[in-house]
Amino acid sequence: VPPWPGAKSAGKARLEIDGRVTELPVVVGTEGEHGIDIAKLRSSTGAITLDEGFVNTGSTTSAITFLDGEKGILRYRGYPIEVLAEKCDFVEVAYLLIYGKLPDAAELDGFRMALSHHTMIHEDMRSFYNGFPRDAHPMAILGSVVGALSTFYQDSLDVRDPRQVEVSVHRLLAKLPTIAAYSHKKSIGQPLIYPRNDLSYCENFLQMMFAVPCEEYHCDPDFADALDMLLIVHADHEQNCSTSTVRMVGSSDANLFASISAGISALWGPL
């Protein structure tokens, strides 16, 4: 995998305002794309930029994901999505996105164990689902319950503490399938099914979605593989609307559950 060089310098761009010339750094991204660094524009000229919709503006540098939908290119941490989809499962890809590298066997086992430790949601949260109308939109339920996690798991809300943030990340990855499956069960009037930690990430999600207490459930391996592939492909999509929303809310030092809840609301829209 090639190293991530970050934003390299590529000369200067000259901007003239009222006869005064200001030089701005030109940077080059990992795929050879050029950008103009305007961080010092206002302090140097008193001017600001106007870019409605931020069509021409990159909000940050990142070494996580590169996406070019028109060319069919998607890379996580430099790895082509085709390689990851063939060689890894979703949990491995999640580790890669979070920690910046693929895990070794011991790291992967520890990560899987950390996730399995957090699959259940607080029992009192089950009552939330009784308060939602049966036809409630799944995104409304998802955003509400994720936001409410901050009231039940107050020991991991300090965004300045890396360990607490890590615990919140583990909790979100582990609990989101449970929250989503409970939403589905509510919509069809079936009992909520507890998670099973002896199953894989995708197998567990499918059994919570489709199992019923009165009969044994067997997960189709093809369904689990297809879901795994779907989660890998959609694991990260650069600086899209929901990602930008999470970053914006998080910039206020809001806890991770609140930030992700806001991102879910942004993802809800049809655009």
Predicted regions and their residues:
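Hydrophobic alpha-helical bundle cores within soluble ligand-binding/oligomerization subdomains
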Residues: P3-L271
